[in-house]
Each structure stands twice: as structure tokens, then as C-alpha cells.
Amino acid sequence: KGVLNGQDLAGWEATYEAPLTYHYAGLEIGKCGPWSQGPVQLQTLALLNEMGVADWNPVSTDFVHRVTEALKLAFADREAYYGDPDFVKVPLKQLLSREYNRERSKEISDRASLELRPGKISGFEVRMPEFDSSGRGDERFSAMGIGEPTVSKKGETRGDTCHVDVVDRWGNMVSATP
């Protein structure tokens, strides 16, 4: 017994949307919108660009540290600001702006941060989920079964999504995030 049934699939229609893009190192990088995690990669590139990543040794510990810290900041902003733009206002212009990422990049030091540090964007409220730093976990999810981590043995879900890309030998491709 799965989570989807025939009616779910019969009523579904594919949609098309323009990708969210960022120009980096002469390339145009395209990702899905803020209903996905796509903008995290774009913001990470924006942060690294502001810090001069092109001049770093890509096999150095400093490179790995700074990329990791940039990812932490971008993921913190994802937690605070992302959502489906059909339902919430998402400050994408600010999150990907040069000015915002220049200021955010100054938060990266030689020491690893253990804090979840979303940035502050004028006119937008930071919306953070509850976070248990003790590592005990949430009892509500102790009944989850093997396989898809968000589905309990009873077929109940907690609302997460999944993503699949399929390319066949003829070059036909589908990319779906339900």
C-alpha cells in the first residue's frame, strides 16, 4: 500500500516554469524555484563569488571549510524564507543579490559555526521550524518504516516531497518534484 493512488495520478498535470538562474564563471546555472532546494545552490555560488572562490585552491582545507560554511548560510536562509511562491512571498531577489551575499559572506570566519544563522531581510519575517539541538529526535517519527523516510508503516506521511529525474537511451527526459 503506497501513499499515491490512481485518482492522484489521474488528476495530476505537469507544469512548466522558467528556471531561476544565476550567472557564475561565464555560465548560466538554472535551478527550480524556492518550492525546492534549487536556490540554495545559486545562493551558495553567490556567497562564494563574493569571497573570491576563483582564487582558492580547490583541494585545500580552506576551500572545503569556506564552501561548507557558505552552504550552511544558504541552507539557513532556505529554512527561514523558502516556500511555494503560490502561497508565500519569497525574497528571492534579495537572497540572490550581490549586496546581500556580500554582507552574508562576512559572517564566514576561520572557525566553523555550529549555529543555524539565517540572514535578516527587510520586510520579511524569519520563519524557522522548531529545532531540537539535543539530538533526541522527535517521537512522532519513531514509527517510520524502512524505505521512504517520511512514510510510516500505515502509509501516513509528514508532508515531505521527493524528486526524480529520468533520462532514457534516446535522450527523452522527465524531471519531477511532486
Set out the residue ranges of the language-model regions.
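Flexible, polar/acidic helix-loop-strand segments at domain edges
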Residues: 39
